[in-house]
Amino acid sequence: MLIELQDLGKSFGEHEVLKHVTASVERGDRIGIIGANGTGKTTLLRVLCGESLPDAGDAAFAAGATCGYLEQTGHLDPEKDVYETMRLAFQPALDAMAELETLQKQLAADHHNTAITDKITACNAVIDAMDAYNMDTQIKKVLNGMSFPADTWKKKAGVLSGGEQTRLRLARLLLERPDILILDEPTNHLDLETMDWLETYLKAYRGAVLVVSHDRYFLDSVCTRIWELRGKTITTYRGNYSAYLPQREAADERLQKQHDADVEKAAKLQDYIDRNLVRASTTKMAQSRRKQLEKLEITEAPQAEAHQLNFRFEYDIEPYDELVIMKGLTIRIGERTLLEALDYVVHRGDKLIIAGPNGTGKSTLLQVLDGKRRPSGGMVRLG
């Protein structure tokens, strides 16, 4: 058992965020954490990685277990390049290598010093555990998988875009290989190819993975369990996201039936009390019913999901059918051509997806369409 939560609660002032949370994490688990915005997912993650203490109950961690947490926001040393940043994942092994060199020199002068040989053994254990003599191979594998080609490895972290920095933080965390890997929306800023690589990597991960994500396809591919945060507590479901849906529906039906039965029982008890409390012959029986009513706990009905809002705006003039017209649109950055001689018309009612690997110009195209960047050739006109 890596983590065990027992009747855990967490509040901020008078605002209760989590209550009666009981759950466990074992090595090999891949747990998807889902719930509406504001239900306490990030708060739970901070408790799980030890950054925040519970106000009630207990969070117990396996002795010596390491935890790595990828937040949605984070920082890198802006002066270190991409490759140097990745080498930081091996810092314990790099320190052990430096110490090992010193110890070997000491041992050469004092062959029978068991204290030195013990330290050498400890250093080698750290190096072997991280497979540090193959660190360059590992670094290159993860960088390539996370869409950092070799020509980016010498770039300073400070000049990377926000999305690239997030990918680099994730790449470094994967190399650190903590026992408990906690990821908050890891698929943000990933293209489809990188997502496929990450899914494969996580499915083979030897530790436990806990991930907050709104991407049901990612949850289906990676997760073996689902934690649903609803009503300030966790309900655990076996299987991936698709397996969770019918389980939750069945659980909600059971809860609703129990809630309705409890409400009906309470109403009958109250009705009996109202009719019989003032009658001398039935007062004792009515008082007994009152005690039953006081002890009766009404099962909480399942919380309905928030309904999607639909807006419809009236207009006096019928809008154009052709909303965006592109003719010979060309986009270049420096000597690199991102788009060349595109002819395309976006019609009213179209719903488009712009897909492509990172760095192919998706965001740049949107900036051109929005008028924030001038095209290198051709034209864009709004209808």
Q: What spans do the regions from the language model cover?
A:
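Intracellular alpha-helical coupling/juxtamembrane segments of multi-pass membrane proteins
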Residues: 247-296, 300-302
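ABC ATP-binding cassette signature C-motif
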Residues: 1-259, 307-383
